[in-house]
């Protein structure tokens, strides 16, 4: 978990880890390999998947179609595992609630072959109870699939679900 106030650099770090931005100096290593040398497109496709605060779903598709874009084999089962019903799986994503859309985004990230999931404020648009449920779901499902999940949040409650917390505060990073 990466925890800190707005503007503390949490999302910048996630952008660097995801290959969405390049460092001005130094390098980012994954399993000892510089991600810039892997080819960023290949890195983003094979090594990391994303869960964004705004869900980043294809709006004219159903949840099933959104997940099939990542892995044609992982459809209904994955969507059921994140708590969606058969009816919800086949609806247009715009007809789903924010919590349901976030579950679709999580299912899509979990379906990716990538071993790392980067989640930027994945519960920022959700009420407290739904945020707790979605965080637990993401962390538990990622663990069961042997994936590493890195969640950026400003919420102590969300961060409590993590094994390790990096706290960004006043230009310093502490590990808890």
Model-inferred region functions:
Residues 117-120:
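Catalytic Walker B motif of ABC-type/P-loop ATPase nucleotide-binding domains
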Residues 78, 82-94:
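Conserved ABC nucleotide-binding domain
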Residues 26-34:
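Conserved ABC transporter NBD signature motif
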Residues 35-49:
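ABC ATPase NBD coupling module
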Residues 106:
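Hydrophobic anchor residue at the start of the ABC signature
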Residues 18:
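Helix-to-loop junction immediately C-terminal to a conserved catalytic motif
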Residues 92-96, 100-102:
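Conserved ABC ATPase signature
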């Amino acid at each position: 978990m990466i925890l800190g106030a707005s503007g503390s650099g949490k999302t910048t770090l996630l952008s660097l880890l995801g290959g969405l931005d390049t460092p001005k100096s130094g390098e980012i290593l994954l399993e000892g390999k510089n991600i810039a040398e892997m080819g960023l497109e290949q890195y983003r496709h094979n090594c990391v998947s994303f869960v964004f605060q705004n869900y980043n779903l294809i709006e004219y598709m159903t949840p099933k179609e959104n997940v099939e874009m990542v892995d044609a084999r992982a459809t209904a089962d994955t969507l059921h595992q994140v708590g969606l019903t058969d009816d919800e799986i086949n609806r247009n994503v715009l007809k789903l609630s924010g919590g349901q859309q976030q579950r679709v985004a999580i299912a899509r990230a979990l379906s990716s072959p990538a071993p790392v999931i980067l989640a930027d404020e994945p519960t920022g648009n959700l009420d407290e109870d739904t945020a707790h449920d979605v965080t637990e779901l993401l962390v538990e499902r990622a663990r069961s699939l042997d994936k590493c999940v890195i969640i950026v949040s400003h919420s102590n409650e969300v961060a409590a679900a993590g094994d390790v917390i990096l706290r960004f505060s006043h230009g310093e990073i502490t590990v808890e």
